[in-house]
């Protein structure tokens, strides 16, 4: 079906002009409270909301302190419009945060379309542009601004938006507090904060957090340790500060689960473990100085070091079409000679051997085919990153041709060093779906059926440098008209050196890449009355290809998986062009509303496409994708009640044709069901993991001076699974299981707070109040387990020498009903 286009920005401009003419005679009323919002990564003076041509959203520290918000993604998911979460990793500190269909994720290989800044330091990491949410301490955040669109001032990866965070200091948050919580699944946490200043201008702030839980899914504990400190000095014109952040976290997120196994046991896991350890250290020296009433200087210099290791137990999909049950005579002899006993002498099959392992062990002893006979795999990675840089900007406030004008210009330099290592060790699956490793590695010592070495090793060193300059100017054409022009030029160099296959050429990851681009933006805002503000904007943003994408972009050397790097040819930058228009205003004294439309088109988007060799592919630039939609919001206060609603419609579609691997998709072009094949994406097909409809509501009731209650609701429509990019998958109950979608859902949360006095308060929180079983994401894939959880290889007879497999829909389950209670004591009040 042909998609109907959204109105052009010119229509909104005409609408703004019409409102300006109609209401020109009305007297201009000043807002009682003017909220100033920073419009650059570095702290500056900022602009009033009514001067910003976009649906910017903000939150304060008191919002983060709400007991319902475990971390920053929780707050954004519950309260900010157009934000939703995919829990692909299934750990509360490792979500994919999506805004208007663009993502900030901690998972390598995810296209990162949102930039995140903390006190002017870009948190997107050098390797993969990922964002590790567990490294951001909730209790250190003073404010959050979600800037919409491809705002070029915020630099690379600002395709759909930018998240700008500012931390607390001793002036903004003096005093001390300690808080403790305990709840479901052995969740317990303790956090503290201390802030203050003296009459000499010295100020200080420190906070720490210790969080542990067993997790609601099997074998999914987490241990989070965060500390943040800031020391500074301030006088009437100058503010200097040095901040330090340290984190040491161990996270277990056991990921997606096959739909039948999830229906049998909602807490079950497909394979385990899936552990991530993050250790991080960062320093940031920041300052600003007011030269005079018209000129403000600001800047920072930072250093950050992160070490990430992963240990993942997975199924070896290359064993699914193999004979893995009955050891041969030679294998039985090898087992006996090695001292093993108890192995079957004949007749072993899927019915009587639910978890086979003897052929795996025997093939390791014989150095024969363990890569095919071992049904388990242990994947290990280590990433070491160092990045550092400095930036500076100036803001000038004056007049241009007699009109008020605010100009900000700046520049920055960012550099990084990265080393990434990956290995894979074979093993076998146990009854609890853990993996027992054996002494055989995917290190190139064995060939596959096509004669290619089985080698999953990666050892890559990389360096990058980015120079940038930017400027933004807001000109008040009249008292109610504000025109903003912005632009940023980025020049990035990425140098990769393969430690296993140096020197370039086929299969080498060596590469030297340069990317540069100027991204412009223009916005117009008009405020004809206190009750109405109209805006329209156009902006552009870009991102450079990641090392993961560059490392698997060679058609002559396709990869089995996106992270099985094999070559390093050039890719183009992804460029996003965003149009946005809307209205916002107030009704009475305590009601605010907004309505807007947006369209973002990605050019040269990067997609993992299929190769002629079954199951293989490579990254390439893919025509166009489009994300467009409508946003509506309403917030109000009525006596002791505060309430609000947000609705978003997102139409996210592919706009070009491409062939991609669709082995688990029922509509693929394979000669027989259950075999490997490709699917064709066509313009208009909906993009996976992006729901069409989002609705959020919340209500807070201040019962009296001591008691308060809060109720929240999130409703999300269904979305297509990864692997179902053509939207054509249909279950047949035999070869293909599940709908290829995740269903829509609505969940509620309820919180209560009791303030005993100015210092002491108690709180309780219940999330997923009605214990709804739901999923936030889905993916198609071959399954190695039957409905009862037993391993099954060769589930069907061979067709033309190939063995069909069972493919299913894998789901990312949401947390069941969970509750916790807590106490907070604030000193000095």
Regions found by a protein language model. Give the residues of each.
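C-terminal beta-signal and adjacent terminal beta-strands/loops
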Residues: 542, 715-727, 753-829
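Gram-negative outer-membrane beta-barrel transporters
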Residues: 391-396, 478-479, 590-603, 618-725, ...
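A beta-strand signature from Gram-negative outer-membrane beta-barrel systems
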Residues: 123-125, 134-177, 189, 826
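Surface-exposed extracellular loop regions of Gram-negative outer-membrane beta-barrel proteins
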Residues: 248-263, 417, 493-500, 512, ...
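Membrane-embedded beta-barrel scaffold of Gram-negative outer-membrane proteins
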Residues: 290, 296-302, 306-314, 527, ...
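Transmembrane beta-barrel wall of Gram-negative outer-membrane proteins
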Residues: 182-212, 217-254, 273-296, 486-488
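Face-selective signature of the C-terminal outer-membrane beta-barrel domain
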Residues: 239, 279-311, 315-317, 321-499, ...
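Periplasmic plug
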Residues: 89, 94-148
